[in-house]
Amino acid sequence: MIGIDTNILVRYLTEDDLVQSVKATELIKKYFGQENSIFINNIVICELVWVLEKGYKYSKEQIIMVLKEIFSTVEFSFENQQILWLSILEYETHKTDFLIF
């Protein structure tokens, strides 16, 4: 299992930097088909939401879609997936910032 940081996840998702995006994608593709082989901690998720919202001007709906897609990816493992799902539901249904309880 490897751990990835916010930068790798942002580059993979946004494909905003040709060189870094290719490297991030290649790294993640090495683990395709291997369940729970890429660890993402809670801080990375919080930073991802902040970067997508503030830096890339993603809407709340776009961020929710990205988070649900990430959490549905079998290769990714999380610090506490149940709490993260609850955080997404809270974020989706209330006028709040994204918080991990």
Regions found by a protein language model. Give the residues of each.
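Acidic active-site catalytic centers that drive phospho-/nucleotidyl reactions
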Residues: 5-7, 47, 100
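Glycine/small-residue-rich phosphate/adenosyl-binding loop
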Residues: 57-67, 71, 75
